[in-house]
């Protein structure tokens, strides 16, 4: 019997290419580019070859104080001041440079006032003549530094107030008592002098009493406060008294969430600011603008814990007076700084203290016919504040 021959080896079938793993499968972005641009913290504009604005993100609308409907289609030359270096940067990019930037650019318009910014212009590539304009306002560190300076000024007044309460009021009581004893046994002509002593002692005591509010170290009792209710209350008080001849303009954002604060203390802040604005405004044609807005604020770390307060609520008080003298600006929030004949110079020092106690930031910008004080305040967040057993006592200056 013939032996069966060995079976010939089967031809090897070529390996089937393995499908790529799902982890390597390219993922196409499914996010609308405008959503990503609106999430950026800086103003962004797209400008075409004709110099017209084609797109603005939310930050750009907030920065320039105009809506997208008003800005898109507007020539950039109508938005920026004449001879702005921004136009030169755009021209450089449209002539072939991929990117151009400049620091220290001043954008100053009647609506927003002066802003010192860094401008970056980048070629989009498609369409070829379109550019992306980014505005970066490097004022955060300056705001925090100024706020801490105001807090230090308030602390110095606090120490002085505590000292005065013990070291001045007690001797004054003795002086006043001695003057009253002298008055019982002196002539009528001398009683004029003893009454003068008593009146001046009372005046000094009243001043010390005003300063003692700075030494109040009790924690703030805070809750959700409607800032528009506060502003309306202060406006009515002002118009019924010291600001009866002032025209008030209200530019409120009705969608603002509540402030995390103390209502009475907030009233004191804005009553002081509005009173100063009314006294600075001209007798004829005086005008005060009260405005509120939501901004992407910084987060301040609170002392003694990990809690951070978001400061997105911006309240502005603007007047059309002559402006703040240059020699007062660097020390404006110090105690006893005033241009008023009978002023004590404690109003703005107290404002700085209360704003700091709320964990907020106060700043000002002044030029002839336009002085504005801006107060950034924390937003009430029930979920966040439920774990914060102790109210805040100012800011530590950390940025997150």
UniProtKB/Swiss-Prot annotation:
**Which keywords fit this entry according to its UniProt record?**
ATP-binding, Cytoplasm, Hydrolase, Kinase, Nitrogen fixation, Nucleotide-binding, Phosphoprotein, Transferase, Two-component regulatory system
Its annotated compartments are: Cytoplasm
* Chief localization: cytoplasm
Q: What is the role of the protein in this entry? A: Member of the two-component regulatory system NtrB/NtrC, which controls expression of the nitrogen-regulated (ntr) genes in response to nitrogen limitation. Under conditions of nitrogen limitation, NtrB autophosphorylates and transfers the phosphoryl group to NtrC. In the presence of nitrogen, acts as a phosphatase that dephosphorylates and inactivates NtrC.
Regarding how it is modified after translation, the entry says: Autophosphorylated.
Keyword ATP-binding included in the entry's annotation? yes
A GO BP entry: regulation of DNA-templated transcription
| Signal sequence segment | none
| Name used for this protein in its record | Sensory histidine kinase/phosphatase NtrB
Domain spans labelled PAS: 29-99
Q: Tell me which Pfam families the record gives.
A: HATPase_c, HisKA, PAS
Instruction: Identify the EC number(s).
Output: 2.7.13.3, 3.1.3.-
Q: Where is the Histidine kinase domain?
A: 163-381
Question: Which segments carry the region annotation Disordered?
Answer: 1-27
GO cellular component term of the entry, any: cytoplasm
| Molecular-function annotations in GO | ATP binding; hydrolase activity; phosphorelay sensor kinase activity
The record's annotation in PANTHER family points to: PEROXIDE STRESS-ACTIVATED HISTIDINE KINASE MAK3, SENSOR HISTIDINE KINASE
The record's section on CDD domains has: HATPase_Glnl-NtrB-like, HisKA, PAS
Compositionally biased residues, Low complexity: 1-10, 18-27
């Amino acid at each position: 019997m013939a032996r069966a021959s060995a079976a010939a080896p089967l031809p090897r079938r070529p390996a089937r290419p393995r499908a790529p793993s799902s982890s390597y499968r390219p993922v196409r972005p499914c996010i609308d580019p405008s959503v990503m641009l609106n999430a950026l913290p800086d103003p962004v504009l797209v400008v075409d070859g004709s110099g017209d604005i084609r797109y603005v993100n939310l930050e750009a609308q907030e920065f320039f104080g105009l809506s997208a409907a008003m800005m898109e289609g507007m020539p950039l030359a109508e938005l920026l001041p004449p001879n702005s270096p921004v136009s030169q940067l755009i021209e450089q990019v449209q002539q072939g440079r991929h990117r151009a930037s400049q620091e220290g650019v001043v954008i100053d318009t009647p609506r927003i006032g002066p802003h010192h910014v860094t401008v970056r212009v980048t070629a989009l590539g498609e369409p070829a003549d379109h550019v992306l304009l980014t505005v970066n306002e490097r004022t955060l560190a300056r705001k925090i530094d100024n706020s801490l300076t105001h807090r230090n000024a308030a602390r110095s007044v606090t120490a002085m107030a505590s000292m005065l309460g013990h070291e001045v009021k007690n001797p004054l009581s003795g002086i006043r008592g001695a003057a009253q004893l002298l008055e019982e046994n002196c002539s009528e002509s001398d009683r004029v002098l003893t009454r003068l002593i008593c009146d001046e002692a009372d005046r000094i005591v009243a001043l010390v009493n005003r300063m003692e509010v700075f030494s109040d170290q009790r924690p703030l009792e805070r809750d959700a406060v409607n800032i528009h209710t506060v502003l309306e209350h202060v406006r009515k008080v002002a118009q019924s008294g010291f600001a009866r001849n002032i025209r008030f303009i209200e530019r409120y954002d009705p969608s603002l969430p509540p402030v995390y604060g103390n209502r009475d203390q907030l009233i004191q802040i804005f009553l002081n600011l509005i009173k100063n604005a009314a006294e600075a405004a001209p007798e004829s044609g005086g005008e005060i603008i009260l405005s509120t807005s939501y901004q992407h604020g910084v987060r301040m770390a609170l002392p003694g814990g990990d809690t951070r307060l978001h400061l997105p609520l911006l309240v502005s008080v603007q007047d059309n007076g002559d402006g703040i003298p240059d020699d007062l600006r660097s020390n404006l929030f110090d105690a006893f700084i005033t241009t008023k004949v009978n002023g004590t110079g404690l109003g703005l020092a107290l404002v700085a203290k209360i704003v700091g106690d709320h964990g907020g930031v106060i700043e000002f910008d002044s030029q002839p016919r336009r002085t504005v004080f801006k107060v950034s305040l924390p937003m009430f967040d029930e979920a966040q504040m439920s774990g914060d057993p102790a109210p805040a006592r100012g800011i530590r200056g950390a940025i997150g």
